[in-house]
């Protein structure tokens, strides 16, 4: 298995990670970005950028992200796409190495680094989980269709939730899934008419587009009861429909013991219910760094975590200010702090003449 040695390993290739890489590479620090999927993430799926200084609003988030990545690469950043990080060691006691004290593991290679940056962002779902939701998280349960949708090509999936996010994610899944069961526990027509959503026009356009998709089955006024599965992962979801059904074919068997309960045969469950929001992606951290009560990584003013030489930037910190410009700022601060840390400087160096 290949071993990559570097000064700075960055997990995540969003605006925070790319900005950090730009600065560390300009400081002549060997930098590697490990990116799970370059076309996912909050910025990548944004259709237009209207609030990033100096960027024309006709530019998409993905275009801006590619420019950030290319700029970092111009200064020497090594970019690894489709990187599935599943574990990390963050102290010299764990790595048994006095120089490369951080190790990141993927199925295809190992990265040894002198410093580590966590920039994996967040995905939407906080609040009380449904039975089986946490058990099958990462094994069929997901909060990010744009991250995991391609894994469910020609499969049956369920999307639960009546929010704008649920509608957009369900639309994305129609590109891959055989059938998308869209489950809402409310009357959608009443919800949109009442103006509960902030962007009524956009929501109704997306809603109409979703309902016109041939592979979408909408089950409204339907409750999600449980996610079920086996050792292989999710095999279905148990739902409860109103008398007469919820407006679509169930695709499963009715449970005679409990009238109105139906088991839908699905391989993926994308949940955007009550409490949908931002959940930092920290599953690979294995409790090796301190998190706050909401799951965000705790950092100091230099973006350093509870472990020396490990930094966290962007939405993984779970701040209220989830903006591209804020994520980029985090990346800049972390990079300058890393340069100071690795070179044992007393003061932060403002900029560098790149060699």
Predicted regions and their residues:
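FAD-site-proximal beta/loop scaffold in flavoenzymes
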Residues: 129, 134-151, 246-250, 272-322, ...
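A Rossmann-like FAD-binding core segment of flavoenzymes
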Residues: 69-105, 111, 177-301, 340-355
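Beta1-alpha1 glycine-rich phosphate/pyrophosphate-binding loop at the start
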Residues: 6-75, 161, 167-200
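Phosphate-coordination loops involved in phosphoryl transfer and adenosine-cofactor binding
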Residues: 5-7, 82, 153-155, 221, ...
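Glycine-rich dinucleotide-binding loop and its adjacent helix/turn
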Residues: 122-171, 176
